[in-house]
């Protein structure tokens, strides 16, 4: 039987969710099993593998797929999908996140050493991350434009790089680079400028019945194995047909 989550507690101290056997159980240990058929019956959106580099893999995450799980389980997450479908199979470690409602490039590490090396690059802000967003209206300020409004009391920096016309004259597509990775940073900064992202029900027009039109289109970092700079890009296909769906 597959469980949504499995925990082990030792001497009244909670440990992390148990994914694989790491030690023998002892007298007094307690296993806590959480099973929810509604969760396990869900079919995750299918991501596309951009490259399998062995120590890490790069994916095109679709709308609706979680980056990682919660304390209750990791069904319908990119981390779990990569563990189940990559061959040869190997563990997966999260090094950054992408909103469930967004789509685009994500990087997954498969070794502890590569996870540490990649995580340190994100922490040092040396990873280049570009996003394309279909927004309401046009950004009226001169570009490039730096937005530095703090998010949840923490420093946050976004750079609006460029803008192009969308098919709908009431909309435009902007390219955004971020130096920090705060929660919903691109969404919140664009909404602050008066140009909320199409389909953003949290910071934009709540009645819109389309997916969040936000896509991670460029990811550049140093390969932890070779030490060489690697760059991955996806096409900016926003501004045409939007897709009906669900957002956070």
Residue ranges and their predicted role:
Residues 1-248:
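RNA pseudouridine synthases
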């Amino acid at each position: 039987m597959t469980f949504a989550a499995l925990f082990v507690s030792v001497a009244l101290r909670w440990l992390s969710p148990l994914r694989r056997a790491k030690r023998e159980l002892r007298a007094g240990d307690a296993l806590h099993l959480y099973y929810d058929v509604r969760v396990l019956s869900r079919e995750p959106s299918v991501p596309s593998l951009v490259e399998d580099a062995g120590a890490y893999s790069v994916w095109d995450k679709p709308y609706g797929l979680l980056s990682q799980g919660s304390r209750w389980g990791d069904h319908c997450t990119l981390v779990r999908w990569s563990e189940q479908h990559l061959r040869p199979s190997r563990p997966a470690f999260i090094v950054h996140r992408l909103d469930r409602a967004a789509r685009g490039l994500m990087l997954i590490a498969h070794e502890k050493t590569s996870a540490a090396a990649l995580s340190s690059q994100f922490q040092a802000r040396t990873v280049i991350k570009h996003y394309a967003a279909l927004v309401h209206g046009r950004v009226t300020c001169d570009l490039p434009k730096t937005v530095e409004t703090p998010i949840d009391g923490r420093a946050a920096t976004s750079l609006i790089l460029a803008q192009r016309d969308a098919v709908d004259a009431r909309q435009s597509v902007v390219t955004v680079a971020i130096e920090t990775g705060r929660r919903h940073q691109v969404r919140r900064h664009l909404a602050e400028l008066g140009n909320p992202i199409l389909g953003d029900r949290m910071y934009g027009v709540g009645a819109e019945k389309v997916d969040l039109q936000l896509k991670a289109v460029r990811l550049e970092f140093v390969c932890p194995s070779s030490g060489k700079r690697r760059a991955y890009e996806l096409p900016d296909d926003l501004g045409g047909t939007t897709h009906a769906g669900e957002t956070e």
